[in-house]
Amino acid sequence: MTLFFKRHGLIFVLAFLVGSLIVFPNIFAVNRLGSDFKGIFPAFNDDEFHYLGMIREAYDGHYSLGNVFSGEHKDAPSLTQPLAPIIFAFFAKVFNLSIPATMAINDFISPFAGVLLLYLLLFGLFESRVIAGSFSVLYYLFFISLFSRPVNPQFSFLFFYLGLFFIWKIISDKEITLRRLALFNFGLAVVFGIVFYIYPFVWTSILAVYGLALLFLVLKEKRAIFYLKGLLFFAAPVALAAIPYVLNLKRVIADPNYLDTFLRFGFILNHYPSALLNVALIMSGLAIIYFVSRGADFKQKIFVYSLALAGVALNWQNVITGKILSFSPHYYTTIVLFLFIIFAFCISMVWKNYKENLLSARNYLAVILMAILLVFVFNHTGKQNLIGYKAFWLMKPGDIAELRDPQKLSGLVDWFDKNSPKDSVVYSFGNDCDWLIPTYTYNNLYFHCSNGLFLASDDELENKWVIQNFFTEAIDKKYIENSSMNIWDSKFIERYQNEAVRNKILSFLKIKKDIPASVLVPEEYIDRVLQKVDFYQKMGFEKALKQYTVNYILLYANNDEYSDQAAKLRTYSFLKLVADIEDNLVFEVVK
């Protein structure tokens, strides 16, 4: 053990520093606020409150995550992977912590573990502490802001590194026996079975890499039966692990809202190539492999070629299947990870050739291309992540209102926890509390922009959006188009973006002239929402509001846009003012 830490101790120090950098904004914010800190943590990343809301939902006992933010459909089958929220909810309960506090602590733990596991993978591949340590730390620094996002990729990528590590062990073991092969396959199955219920962009990547690596290994060694026997120790446990998923899927398909929801997830029929940036990057990685792979260990070549080809397959599988995965840009972090492993392979081979006086022009080309790609990825990703790393603006002296103002909402959280029934529904407007209610209380929102990610009909989502915007003036076609993601999620944006890609390809190849401009939201949907606006305005606020479950109305009285609403709400006989906390008015809806 002493020898181990003597050889690899530095990576623990570097992992500690990376974890500290990522958790630092939270520590700094809490310390800067001092006695003014009331338990409301700042957010440093997109989608942070989405994941915190999922964890809070599991914390409150709704383990299926049927609908995280709405009062309806709580017992619906899950469309999102529930395992990570359940794990973090468990730890929050065990240590009696709030969900944001739990995840703030995890801002250190997961990146710390991630750097170590990525180092384990790279050291296993190239047996160089310098190469493994450098690229492990560099990868996290390039995504320093992104790795502060809870669950994905912060937590899920831990299993990504482990999955790739087991794949490498399967193909690289020089004294492989059936017993060892079975052991590594079983280890991979355990990792795969866990991440299968955490993040699809990780398990699909693991599956693609393993399938290609195994294919290449069988073709090279001509030992198909041997490796197929080992594969059984992967396939059988995975099949067992998938049983709950299959049972849940049967419930999903049987749900009357399935078709609307399926289309909102962006699974559309399109055979045109997309994700062009991802593919361009990984194709450049293929070129680097080609330039430096002469004389390399054939199993290393199998592994890195599998990474590169898996990257192409994951992004362009729709050319064959026609199915485009919703949010395909989420594979970008995967592509960059594959690139960094290829870069490590490049450096290890160039160093090997340098020591043996075998450097060639191809090696120099590989290094130049790698440098160009590093600069590009930093400019495209790392630079944005550093800007997003809020410690920089937190460190500026002077006004810290951005940190202090949310603390005023702690009284609101305390009031709801003490006075509202569990799973109450809050109609919130004028105070931008969509993030607060689902994260810090056990209550739900009347409308939330993420409701489209759960089983619900388009009709219900449109109705709730219209009622939520009852007091919004001048709702027109442009306003609805700009709100399309809030209403229908990815139903139209994915099709719109893919049509734009297709039109660019057709125009570039001059295959088709006079290509009509892509339409974001079809006219019939615009007209339908406008009709609902008129319908609910004529119905009146009380009847419109009570179309769906609602218990409270929350209004921030100092919002200029809603300055006259406080007086108006006081006039409604079905509303009773029950709290006034820092100008946040809470009205109880009388049935």
Model region roles, listed by residue range:
Residues 1-32, 182, 368:
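Start-transfer (signal-anchor) and selected internal transmembrane alpha helices
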Residues 20-159, 200-204, 391-403:
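Active-site lumenal/periplasmic loops and adjacent helix-entry segments of GT-C-fold
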Residues 47, 72-73, 191-327:
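Transmembrane catalytic cores of multi-pass membrane glycosyltransferases
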Residues 55, 370-457:
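Extracytoplasmic
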Residues 166-193, 228-229:
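Short hydrophobic alpha-helices at membrane interfaces in multi-pass membrane enzymes
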Residues 204-205, 324-355:
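Hydrophobic/aromatic-rich transmembrane helices and adjacent perimembrane loops
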Residues 232-239, 350-387:
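Signature aromatic-anchored transmembrane alpha helix within multi-pass, membrane-resident enzymes
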Residues 444-552:
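Luminal/periplasmic acceptor-recognition loop/helix of membrane-associated glycosyltransferases
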